Regions:
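Short helix-capping/linker turns of helical repeat alpha-solenoids
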Residues: 43-47, 59-61, 66, 79-83, ...
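Hydrophobic face of amphipathic alpha-helices that form TPR/SEL1-like repeat modules
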Residues: 19-25, 41, 52-59, 63, ...
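Terminal, low-structured helical/coil segments at or just beyond the last alpha-helical repeat
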Residues: 121-156
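N-terminal leader/linker segments that initiate helical-solenoid repeat arrays
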Residues: 15-36
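Sec-dependent N-terminal signal peptides
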Residues: 4-13
Length: 156
């Protein structure tokens, strides 16, 4: 039993160190190596790794820029409660880049969720997007926020 407890304590520490190493590689411009570090963590469900891969695809860092893949990686991390990725999803919906069209209802929804999660910039984005929305759109967004909030942030 003690062996399993130790494993449960040590594994998250190792995973966090791998993500930090990948961030360091990105800062050094070694994007291909960073991707090699991030993919196994992302495939095992690490939201930080998923968000960083989303950034790489969004900005074309070591990979060809691909808005559809960027959005997908951001969305994976967002559904796990990653506030930075949630702002990324909100931005994609607001601008409509890589999507059929902008969707202000969903943009607002994700900015609000990101703000709930603690992203300090999300409130600014939320204030800007709400200026472009009708009352009805805001009400629809709040229905989505309430749906997502209980699932993504069940204890808030």
């Amino acid at each position: 039993m003690l062996k399993y407890v130790i494993i449960l304590i040590v594994l998250p520490i190792i995973a966090a160190a791998e993500i930090e190493h990948a961030r360091d590689l990105m800062e050094e411009g070694q994007f291909e190596k960073a991707m090699q570090e991030l993919l196994p963590a992302a495939r095992s469900g690490n939201a930080d790794a998923e968000e960083l891969i989303g950034i790489m695809y969004a900005m074309g860092l070591g990979v060809k820029r691909d808005d559809i893949r960027a959005f997908d990686w951001y969305l994976r991390a967002s559904m796990k409660g990653h506030p930075g990725a949630q702002s990324g999803v909100g931005w994609y919906y607001e601008i409509g880049r890589g999507l059929p069209a902008p969707d202000l209802i969903r943009a607002y929804t994700w900015y609000v969720l990101s703000a709930i999660g603690g992203d300090p910039d999300a409130a600014i984005s939320q204030e800007e997007v709400v200026k472009k929305m009708t009352r009805e759109e805001i009400e629809k967004a709040h229905v989505l926020i309430n749906d997502y909030k209980v699932w993504i942030y069940p204890f808030r």
